[in-house]
């Protein structure tokens, strides 16, 4: 998508009520303001404890501050039909939305869908 709508989650529960010394006020809100000056269509900080109830449907991308903040609810909603990517690196890093699934080795039960989603994302990047 040309101009995706991006949700940026806060770090603390309830965005630490946006108190003066919270990471949301010191770091996240200024970063969002900077992104907006670059015409990046982003919103936040959004509390991570409520976005996955329904609000996630209004966004193309959800940026979390750490792995389980996003992936735990994301997997509950989408199972393994999704990918995740890591931002802030010098290279593109995408990953299927599941772990190594060592218990499935040599059992012919693993799904290849998430891997194909990664490949298709990279091809269209």
Question: What role is predicted for each listed range?
Answer:
Residues 1-45:
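Glycine-rich phosphate/diphosphate-binding loop of Rossmann-like nucleotide-binding domains
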